[in-house]
Each structure stands twice: as C-alpha cells, then as structure tokens.
Amino acid sequence: MTEPTNLRLIDLLAATAHELVAGVNADACTVSRVIGDVLILITERAPEGMTLLGGQGYLVPDYPLTQAVLSSGRPRAMTLSDEDADPAEADVLVELGFASLLMLPLAIGGRTWGLVELYRLEPHPFDAKDMSVAGEILARASARADG
C-alpha cells in the first residue's frame, strides 16, 4: 500500500477529530503527523474562535509524554493537577487554556503515523473508558485510511 497523504486522508482525519471530540466529551482535538522527530499539525477541531497549534511543529524529544505514547503505542492521559505531570506538556496545556489531555498514537499502514491529542477545558481527567472509545474511533479511521 502507498502511504495516504492526499486530501481524502485530510478529510478523513478532520471527520475523525470531530467524532473524537463528541465521542469522549472533549473540547478540542488535534491530529498531527510524525515525521522523524517532528510533529506537524494536520487538522484540529477547536471551540469556535479558538486556534490551537496554528501550524506549529513540535520536536518530539522535547515532550517526554508524547515520546512515550509514540514509542509504546499506548495512550496516556494527564491533567494539570497531576503530581507527575510532564512539565513540557503542562506548559502547552496552560498556553492553550486547557486542563486535561489525552494522547493516542495513530496507526496507518501498520505503523505509527501520527498523534491525536484530545483536550478538556475543565480538569475532568480522561479515563480508561475515554481511552477505549477514542481507540475504537481511531481503529475505524485507520482501517478506512488503509482501505
């Protein structure tokens, strides 16, 4: 299979971000592509009038929790009130105005293609059910991208 990089994929990821926000009662979502050690924003779903990452790229090694999600292939959640919150991720949450974060790897073509980040304005933590629902939504999106 050739790697999908076309408009169809971007549309699929935008629709997936919308579905994720509704599915786990999040306030916002970003979907980023991992290229080497850089995360590049592909699409976002944010409250009206809010821009999240504005096309910025982030160096994965600067964000240990992000790196752990991508290397392990397992989702991770944090809130600003967590005693062991990743300081780099906490800084981004504060900058964006959010209190809770759920990160999930996005697999396309049998490998980690990107990262999905879900945000909540309130400090209501994402839980195992949220991770499961988000994982199911991403699995369907991955299957459609691979199809």
Where are the model-predicted features located?
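Regulatory sensory and allosteric helical modules in signal-transduction proteins
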Residues: 34, 51-91
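A short, aliphatic-rich beta-strand micro-motif
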Residues: 99-107
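Short hydrophobic/aromatic beta-strand element in the GNAT-like acyltransferase core
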Residues: 28, 90, 103, 115
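GAF sensory/regulatory domain recognition
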Residues: 18-19, 30-54
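Signal-transducing coiled-coil linker helices
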Residues: 1-16
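Short N-terminal helix-loop-first-beta-strand/juxtamembrane motif that initiates sensory/input modules
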Residues: 23-29
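Regulatory loop-to-helix N-cap segments in sensory/regulatory domains
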Residues: 119-137, 144-146
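Sensory-domain boundary capping and coupling elements
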Residues: 66, 106-120
